Design a protein with these regions (language model features):
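Binding-site signature for planar aromatic cofactors or substrates
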Residues: 1-169
Length: 169
């Protein structure tokens, strides 16, 4: 059984998807980066950025960050700390990925860096919650053995390199 067959659509209505496509707001995570991001732990974990209530940036490494599909990152939030306190449906999130060998190989420019900007949606139960847990790497599962955390999907709205140029890979 494919995941797409069991999960609800990630947009509210087909009209929302058509509108998003017309407006050009959907941004894909380049397929050439999927495996690099999904195997980033432990050497090249993604940094996740959110804004604190005082406006300062909260940046934290998340070994649980993974590509969920072409348009979404997923991560497991263990339920403690200031990032957890600031994550809610609609929270703006930055995913910062850096792997210098990708610059050397020519896959990514400027330091092997890709930045993704999007919006979070929280899952505390249901099929997406379970799918995120299922895909989670074992070291992260060990950090939450009682499964008290929650899943987060981040819908990518923009992807760029270090200079702010849209990713073109």
């Amino acid at each position: 059984m494919r995941v797409e067959e069991t999960l609800p659509p990630l947009v509210d209505t087909p009209g929302d998807l058509a509108e998003a496509l017309r407006e050009g707001t959907l941004t894909n995570i380049p397929k050439s980066l999927h495996e690099h991001i999904n195997t980033a732990y432990p050497a090249h974990v993604c940094l996740i950025g959110t804004a604190l209530p005082d406006g300062c940036a909260q940046i934290t490494p998340r070994g649980s960050t993974m590509v969920f599909d072409d348009e979404h990152f997923a991560l497991w939030e263990r339920g403690r700390g200031s990032t957890n306190a600031n994550l809610a449906d609609g929270t703006k999130v930055t995913v910062f990925f850096r792997k210098p060998p990708l610059r050397e190989s020519g896959l990514l420019p400027r330091g092997g860096i890709a930045r993704f900007y999007g919006t979070a949606k929280i899952y505390k139960s249901g099929p997406i919650y379970e799918e995120i847990w299922k895909r989670l790497i074992e070291p992260e599962k060990k950090g939450d053995p009682e499964k008290k955390g929650f899943g987060v999907l981040i819908k990518v709205e923009r992807a760029e390199d270090l200079s702010g140029t849209p990713l073109a890979i």
